[in-house]
Amino acid sequence: MKILVFTDLHGSLNALKELTCSEDFRIADKRIFLGDVCVGCSRPNECIELLNSLDCIKILGNNDYYICDHIPKEEFTCSSEGKIAQMKYMQNLVTEENKKIVNSWSKEYCLNVGGKTLYFTHYPWENVNGEFNVVDDPIEKNFKTISELFSNVKADVVVFGHEHKSRCYTNGEKTYYCLGTVGLVSPGNYLIIDVNDNEINFEEKFINHDINYEIDLMDKAGYPYNRNKIKRAN
Protein backbone atom coordinates (compact mmCIF):
# COMPACT_ATOMS: atom_id res chain seq x y z
CA MET A 1 0.00 0.00 0.00
CA LYS A 2 1.24 3.46 -0.91
CA ILE A 3 0.04 6.29 1.33
CA LEU A 4 0.61 9.93 0.37
CA VAL A 5 0.62 12.36 3.30
CA PHE A 6 0.74 16.15 3.11
CA THR A 7 0.18 18.89 5.64
CA ASP A 8 0.14 22.60 6.43
CA LEU A 9 -1.25 23.86 3.14
CA HIS A 10 -2.12 27.24 4.69
CA GLY A 11 -4.25 28.55 1.84
CA SER A 12 -1.71 27.98 -0.94
CA LEU A 13 -3.94 26.91 -3.83
CA ASN A 14 -1.03 26.61 -6.26
CA ALA A 15 0.66 24.06 -4.00
CA LEU A 16 -2.51 21.97 -3.74
CA LYS A 17 -3.08 22.05 -7.51
CA GLU A 18 0.50 21.01 -8.26
CA LEU A 19 0.32 18.17 -5.76
CA THR A 20 -3.01 16.82 -6.97
CA CYS A 21 -1.75 16.81 -10.56
CA SER A 22 1.32 14.75 -9.64
CA GLU A 23 1.75 11.08 -10.51
CA ASP A 24 2.34 10.28 -6.83
CA PHE A 25 -1.06 11.69 -5.92
CA ARG A 26 -2.76 9.84 -8.76
CA ILE A 27 -1.37 6.38 -7.97
CA ALA A 28 -1.53 6.54 -4.16
CA ASP A 29 -3.79 3.95 -2.55
CA LYS A 30 -4.64 6.41 0.21
CA ARG A 31 -4.16 10.15 0.60
CA ILE A 32 -4.12 11.92 3.95
CA PHE A 33 -4.07 15.66 4.69
CA LEU A 34 -2.86 16.48 8.20
CA GLY A 35 -4.51 19.85 8.59
CA ASP A 36 -4.04 23.62 8.53
CA VAL A 37 -5.72 24.47 5.25
CA CYS A 38 -6.27 27.99 6.67
CA VAL A 39 -4.21 30.96 7.90
CA GLY A 40 -1.17 31.76 5.83
CA CYS A 41 -1.89 32.44 2.17
CA SER A 42 -5.10 34.08 1.09
CA ARG A 43 -7.05 31.37 -0.78
CA PRO A 44 -8.42 29.05 1.92
CA ASN A 45 -11.92 28.85 0.41
CA GLU A 46 -10.59 27.54 -2.89
CA CYS A 47 -8.34 25.07 -1.04
CA ILE A 48 -11.19 23.80 1.15
CA GLU A 49 -13.46 23.32 -1.85
CA LEU A 50 -10.78 21.46 -3.83
CA LEU A 51 -9.87 19.28 -0.84
CA ASN A 52 -13.52 18.50 -0.29
CA SER A 53 -13.80 17.19 -3.85
CA LEU A 54 -10.85 14.82 -3.48
CA ASP A 55 -10.69 11.20 -2.37
CA CYS A 56 -8.60 12.13 0.64
CA ILE A 57 -8.73 11.80 4.42
CA LYS A 58 -8.92 15.30 5.90
CA ILE A 59 -7.67 15.99 9.45
CA LEU A 60 -8.35 19.17 11.42
CA GLY A 61 -5.44 21.50 12.14
CA ASN A 62 -5.32 24.04 14.95
CA ASN A 63 -5.72 26.99 12.57
CA ASP A 64 -8.69 25.27 10.92
CA TYR A 65 -10.27 24.92 14.35
CA TYR A 66 -9.59 28.57 15.18
CA ILE A 67 -11.25 29.98 12.06
CA CYS A 68 -14.45 28.07 12.87
CA ASP A 69 -15.07 30.65 15.62
CA HIS A 70 -13.07 28.67 18.16
CA ILE A 71 -10.07 30.89 18.89
CA PRO A 72 -9.10 29.88 22.46
CA LYS A 73 -8.73 32.65 25.03
CA GLU A 74 -5.14 31.54 25.50
CA GLU A 75 -4.40 32.46 21.89
CA PHE A 76 -5.52 36.03 22.57
CA THR A 77 -3.17 36.33 25.52
CA CYS A 78 -0.04 34.65 24.16
CA SER A 79 -0.21 35.26 20.39
CA SER A 80 1.29 38.29 18.73
CA GLU A 81 -0.96 41.11 17.61
CA GLY A 82 -0.20 40.19 14.00
CA LYS A 83 -1.21 36.54 14.51
CA ILE A 84 -4.51 37.55 16.10
CA ALA A 85 -5.22 40.02 13.27
CA GLN A 86 -4.50 37.28 10.77
CA MET A 87 -6.86 34.81 12.45
CA LYS A 88 -9.67 37.38 12.68
CA TYR A 89 -9.18 38.30 9.02
CA MET A 90 -9.36 34.62 8.11
CA GLN A 91 -12.53 34.09 10.17
CA ASN A 92 -14.23 36.73 8.03
CA LEU A 93 -12.74 35.45 4.79
CA VAL A 94 -13.75 31.78 5.05
CA THR A 95 -17.39 31.23 4.11
CA GLU A 96 -19.85 29.74 6.58
CA GLU A 97 -20.36 26.75 4.27
CA ASN A 98 -16.63 26.07 4.19
CA LYS A 99 -16.39 26.46 7.97
CA LYS A 100 -18.99 23.69 8.25
CA ILE A 101 -16.90 21.48 5.98
CA VAL A 102 -13.72 22.07 7.97
CA ASN A 103 -15.52 21.66 11.29
CA SER A 104 -16.57 18.16 10.20
CA TRP A 105 -12.98 16.96 9.93
CA SER A 106 -11.63 14.64 12.62
CA LYS A 107 -8.62 15.47 14.80
CA GLU A 108 -7.03 12.07 14.15
CA TYR A 109 -7.04 9.04 11.88
CA CYS A 110 -5.83 5.51 12.58
CA LEU A 111 -4.96 2.88 9.99
CA ASN A 112 -4.10 -0.79 10.52
CA VAL A 113 -2.17 -2.25 7.61
CA GLY A 114 0.52 -4.90 7.15
CA GLY A 115 0.32 -5.85 10.80
CA LYS A 116 1.19 -2.29 11.83
CA THR A 117 -0.82 0.55 13.33
CA LEU A 118 -0.32 4.00 11.80
CA TYR A 119 -1.67 7.08 13.55
CA PHE A 120 -2.12 10.45 11.83
CA THR A 121 -2.87 13.83 13.42
CA HIS A 122 -1.98 17.49 13.05
CA TYR A 123 -0.50 17.66 16.55
CA PRO A 124 -1.51 16.52 20.05
CA TRP A 125 -4.60 18.31 21.34
CA GLU A 126 -5.63 19.24 24.86
CA ASN A 127 -9.01 20.26 26.23
CA VAL A 128 -8.86 23.06 28.80
CA ASN A 129 -12.23 24.12 30.19
CA GLY A 130 -13.99 23.06 27.02
CA GLU A 131 -11.55 24.84 24.70
CA PHE A 132 -9.32 22.77 22.44
CA ASN A 133 -5.80 23.80 21.61
CA VAL A 134 -2.66 22.04 20.48
CA VAL A 135 -0.19 21.34 23.27
CA ASP A 136 3.00 23.36 23.67
CA ASP A 137 6.03 22.19 21.72
CA PRO A 138 8.75 20.48 23.79
CA ILE A 139 11.78 22.75 24.11
CA GLU A 140 14.17 19.94 23.20
CA LYS A 141 13.01 17.67 20.40
CA ASN A 142 14.26 14.09 20.41
CA PHE A 143 12.75 10.61 20.49
CA LYS A 144 12.13 10.76 24.24
CA THR A 145 10.33 14.12 24.30
CA ILE A 146 8.27 13.36 21.19
CA SER A 147 7.25 9.95 22.54
CA GLU A 148 6.15 11.67 25.77
CA LEU A 149 4.15 14.13 23.67
CA PHE A 150 2.26 11.20 22.14
CA SER A 151 2.30 8.98 25.24
CA ASN A 152 -1.43 8.22 24.95
CA VAL A 153 -1.13 6.99 21.34
CA LYS A 154 -0.64 3.26 20.86
CA ALA A 155 0.77 2.94 17.36
CA ASP A 156 3.86 1.73 15.54
CA VAL A 157 4.04 4.89 13.43
CA VAL A 158 2.86 8.40 14.31
CA VAL A 159 2.78 10.98 11.52
CA PHE A 160 2.08 14.64 12.31
CA GLY A 161 2.57 18.18 11.03
CA HIS A 162 2.24 21.64 12.62
CA GLU A 163 5.95 22.40 13.06
CA HIS A 164 6.68 23.24 9.39
CA LYS A 165 10.00 21.38 9.69
CA SER A 166 10.58 17.80 8.63
CA ARG A 167 12.02 15.44 11.23
CA CYS A 168 11.99 11.70 11.89
CA TYR A 169 12.45 10.14 15.32
CA THR A 170 12.79 6.37 15.72
CA ASN A 171 14.15 3.76 18.09
CA GLY A 172 13.92 0.97 15.53
CA GLU A 173 10.55 -0.22 16.79
CA LYS A 174 8.48 2.96 16.87
CA THR A 175 8.66 5.90 14.49
CA TYR A 176 7.47 9.50 14.83
CA TYR A 177 7.51 11.37 11.53
CA CYS A 178 6.99 15.13 11.53
CA LEU A 179 6.21 16.55 8.10
CA GLY A 180 7.14 20.04 7.04
CA THR A 181 4.77 22.15 4.93
CA VAL A 182 3.57 21.73 1.38
CA GLY A 183 2.20 25.26 1.10
CA LEU A 184 4.28 27.87 2.91
CA VAL A 185 7.53 27.35 1.00
CA SER A 186 8.51 26.23 -2.48
CA PRO A 187 9.47 23.53 -2.96
CA GLY A 188 7.00 22.16 -0.45
CA ASN A 189 7.29 18.62 0.85
CA TYR A 190 5.08 15.58 1.21
CA LEU A 191 5.58 12.00 2.34
CA ILE A 192 5.14 8.62 0.68
CA ILE A 193 4.67 5.72 3.10
CA ASP A 194 5.11 2.34 1.45
CA VAL A 195 3.72 -0.55 3.51
CA ASN A 196 4.70 -3.96 2.16
CA ASP A 197 4.01 -7.02 4.32
CA ASN A 198 5.53 -6.08 7.70
CA GLU A 199 7.94 -3.50 6.30
CA ILE A 200 7.32 0.26 6.27
CA ASN A 201 9.42 2.63 4.20
CA PHE A 202 9.30 6.43 4.19
CA GLU A 203 10.23 8.67 1.26
CA GLU A 204 10.08 12.43 1.59
CA LYS A 205 9.43 14.17 -1.72
CA PHE A 206 9.22 17.76 -2.90
CA ILE A 207 7.03 19.74 -5.27
CA ASN A 208 7.58 23.17 -6.77
CA HIS A 209 4.72 25.66 -6.84
CA ASP A 210 4.32 29.37 -7.50
CA ILE A 211 4.55 30.79 -3.97
CA ASN A 212 5.47 34.19 -5.42
CA TYR A 213 2.04 34.42 -7.04
CA GLU A 214 0.39 33.69 -3.68
CA ILE A 215 2.47 36.43 -2.05
CA ASP A 216 1.57 38.90 -4.80
CA LEU A 217 -2.13 38.19 -4.19
CA MET A 218 -1.73 38.83 -0.47
CA ASP A 219 0.21 42.04 -0.99
CA LYS A 220 -2.41 43.31 -3.44
CA ALA A 221 -5.27 42.51 -1.04
CA GLY A 222 -3.49 43.95 1.99
CA TYR A 223 -3.79 40.58 3.72
CA PRO A 224 -1.95 40.42 7.07
CA TYR A 225 0.54 37.55 6.77
CA ASN A 226 3.75 36.53 8.49
CA ARG A 227 6.62 37.45 6.17
CA ASN A 228 9.02 35.40 8.28
CA LYS A 229 7.10 32.20 7.49
CA ILE A 230 6.03 32.84 3.89
CA LYS A 231 8.99 33.77 1.73
CA ARG A 232 9.45 34.31 -1.97
CA ALA A 233 11.18 31.62 -3.98
CA ASN A 234 14.38 32.58 -5.76
Residue ranges and their predicted role:
Residues 54-110, 139-151:
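Active-site neighborhood of divalent metal-dependent phosphoester bond hydrolases
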Residues 25-29, 94-169, 228-230:
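His/acidic metal-ligating clusters that form di-metal
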